[in-house]
């Protein structure tokens, strides 16, 4: 039987958080992520992982306090469910999701929701996996979809109106980010250095409160890219991927 661990204020310092294990360049990001989790545990934030060395975990909390531009009540929101490498194909993802569903029912929640996309994108869940458990698309912004599993007739969560704009006034390349992911800190640092070295303007907007997260002008889990006022992607960038993205944009 698989053994799992839920992170707490008592064990978080000695436990890994699955991503960026042993990768030195991301250790500052791991520290930032752990601090973020510590501050969210009081909100009922759950980080449950396999008791093993690997990327195998699920992370969720109440939609009311989740750092996403989604309005709703009495639902749990899944930030991330990830099973990677040799742990795939062993039913672990099923066990993690079933834990979320059962935990939500025990808390008398009205359902569970999560962000996916019509076509697979980095750092988002797989739509077909959630469909297998009865999740249905309840709201859409472009390629991005909000899926929900309903337990009763309570009002379903929706994207906030601000998120539907997918536009900003700023024309320079702009990144919205939060430390919900341990890969973010290094991306911000490397992009910032790249911009300085190449005399480029890249704006960084830190999302560090619930209010800011609920009012971002796009879909958002931990990173969003804008250029010439338009939303481009939710992909976390480094210098190399930024260059590749800008080349692609200029060729279009």
What are these regions (language model features)?
Residues 1-51, 161-162, 171, 181-183, ...:
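Short amphipathic alpha-helix that is part of the acyltransferase structural core
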Residues 42-59, 225-230:
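Conserved beta-hairpin
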Residues 49, 53-65, 77, 82:
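Conserved beta-strand in the GNAT
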Residues 83, 89-104:
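Conserved acetyl-CoA-binding loop-helix of GNAT-fold acetyltransferases
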Residues 104-121:
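Conserved GNAT acetyl-CoA-binding A-motif
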Residues 115, 131-148, 232:
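Conserved catalytic-core motifs of GNAT/GCN5-like acyltransferases
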Residues 142-165:
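C-terminal "cap" of GNAT-fold acetyltransferases
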Residues 228-252:
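Non-catalytic, surface beta->alpha helical segment in thiol-disulfide oxidoreductase systems
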């Amino acid at each position: 039987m698989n053994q799992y661990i839920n992170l707490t204020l008592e064990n978080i310092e000695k436990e890994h958080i699955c991503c960026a294990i042993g990768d030195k360049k991301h250790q500052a990001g791991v520290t930032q992520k752990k601090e973020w989790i510590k501050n969210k545990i009081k909100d009922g934030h759950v980080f449950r992982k396999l008791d093993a060395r690997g990327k195998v975990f699920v992370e969720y909390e109440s939609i009311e306090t989740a750092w996403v531009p989604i309005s709703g009540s009495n639902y749990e929101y899944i930030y991330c469910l990830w099973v990677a490498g040799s742990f795939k194909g062993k039913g672990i993802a099923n066990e993690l999701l079933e834990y979320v569903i059962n935990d939500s029912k025990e808390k008398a929640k009205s359902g569970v929701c999560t962000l996916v996309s019509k076509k697979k994108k980095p750092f988002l869940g797989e739509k077909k996996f959630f469909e297998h458990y009865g999740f249905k698309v309840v709201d859409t912004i472009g390629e991005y979809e909000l899926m929900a599993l309903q337990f009763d007739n309570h009002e379903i969560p929706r994207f906030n109106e601000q998120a539907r704009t997918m536009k900003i006034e700023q024309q320079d390349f702009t990144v919205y980010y939060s430390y919900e992911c341990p890969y973010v800190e290094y991306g911000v640092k490397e992009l910032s250095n790249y911009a300085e070295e190449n005399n480029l303007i890249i704006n960084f907007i830190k999302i560090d409160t619930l209010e800011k997260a609920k009012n971002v002008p796009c879909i958002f889990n931990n990173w969003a890219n804008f250029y010439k006022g338009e939303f481009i992607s939710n992909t976390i960038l480094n210098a190399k991927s930024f260059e590749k993205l800008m080349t692609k944009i200029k060729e279009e």
